[in-house]
Regions:
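Asp-box/BNR beta-propeller blade signature and adjacent active/binding-site loops
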Residues: 1-368
Length: 368
């Protein structure tokens, strides 16, 4: 695998509501057009955050001026913000947007999304919207009801569409903000057979009944044969350490899953890019060893990611005034790659990088 070219989709403006451009994702539409989305705000987590959107019709070499088509509605009588949006093309020109909405009023003194004393989370909800004109206009947001076992819902992946048209949405659970009980984290899959109007009961993807292992930031994709591969940022709560990325595969549309498999690389997986021949390109961010973003390719959704195929997309240099090095704040100023197969057989990877006060959205195109 090799890097074809790279660049910046959008540059930040320090000290403004565009100071931190983070959590990027990209969709390649049936006509080859790319649509990128990302979070824009003064900081990575702020009440003034908005979602920006940009397009490219030349495989990422140039991008349109960012637009802001998505509103942050009030829900349940409180003000909130949309933190992240993922796009899915259900048929040519027909898009679905999945979003994670954050309650910004119920706990106004919260230092962030999580309560450091309880490990609970502020209220979060999942929203959907539809577009019939390739994302030029959008329907109003609609909330996806969640069972109580989920708690505040976390979205880390776009809605997936199976070959038979069934939609699959993966969701991670959280504790409520003031809940002092032990956290038993889980990640589940919901299914819809009516275009996302209603959703069935959750099917467990990852859950440790002892509460020792957490499966965070699940990134998933559908292979040409209909199988789903899911890659988890795996955390051991007893040793307080991140393990290697673990993969699970489903052969029945996400209703049952294989046991977790260590894929041999560490830290946080990207959304995988699946090529028409079944090959899978998986980028990942390694914050705690060499502070980089890398990628490898596997021959199939359940295949081995060849170390010989590895390329480095980004290497982060911690500032001299970050005395903790790999544990300092600077390691959180880059990351969250997202990959997508393009119509010419290449793969686009988008990610954010910069400093604590200014983060840009970057792109790299790979020849797998």
């Amino acid at each position: 695998m090799r890097i074809i070219d790279s660049g910046i989709i959008s540059r930040s403006v320090p000290g403004t509501d565009r100071a931190t451009l983070t959590f990027p994702a990209v969709l390649c539409k049936a006509d080859g057009t790319l649509i990128a989305t990302w979070h824009s705000g003064l900081t990575k987590d702020c009440a003034d955050e908005v979602i920006e959107v940009s397009r490219s019709s030349d495989f990422g070499r140039t991008w349109s001026t960012p637009g802001r088509p998505f509103e942050s509605p009030a829900l349940h009588g409180v003000r909130g913000s949309v933190k992240i949006v993922y796009l899915t093309e259900r048929s040519p020109g027909r898009l679905m947007a999945a979003a994670m909405w954050i309650d910004r009023e119920t706990y106004p003194d919260a230092p962030g999304l999580f309560n450091p004393e309880t490990e609970g989370c502020v209220p979060m909800y999942i929203l959907l919207a539809d577009s019939e004109d390739s994302g030029e206009t959008w329907s109003s947001w609609r909330e996806v009801p969640m069972p109580e076992v989920i708690g505040p819902a976390s979205l880390t992946n776009p809605v997936m569409q199976l070959p038979d048209g069934t939609l699959v949405m993966t969701i991670e659970s959280n504790k409520h903000y003031l809940d002092t009980s032990r956290w038993y984290q889980r990640v589940v899959a919901f299914h819809s057979t009516d275009g996302g109007r209603t959703w069935g009961e959750p099917a467990i993807i990852g859950f440790d009944p002892t509460g020792r292992i957490f499966n965070w930031d699940l990134r998933s994709a559908v292979s040409p044969d209909g199988r789903i591969g899911a890659f988890a940022w795996t955390y051991n709560t007893e040793t307080e350490s991140y393990l290697n990325i673990h993969r699970r595969v489903s052969s029945d549309g996400g209703r049952t899953w294989s046991d977790p498999e260590d894929i041999g690389v560490t830290d946080q997986a990207a959304h995988p890019a699946v090529l028409p021949d079944g090959r899978v390109v998986l980028p990942w961010v390694d914050r705690f060893q060499d502070q980089s973003i890398k990628a490898r390719v596997a021959p199939s959704i359940d295949g081995t990611f060849d170390p010989e195929s590895e390329v480095t997309l980004y290497a982060h240099e911690a500032p001299a005034d970050d005395p903790k090095g790999a544990l300092g704040f600077s390691v959180w100023s880059f990351g969250l790659p997202y990959s997508e197969a393009l119509s010419d057989g290449s793969v686009m990877v988008v990610y954010y990088a910069g400093t604590e006060t200014a983060m840009d959205v970057h792109w790299t195109r790979l020849a797998p």
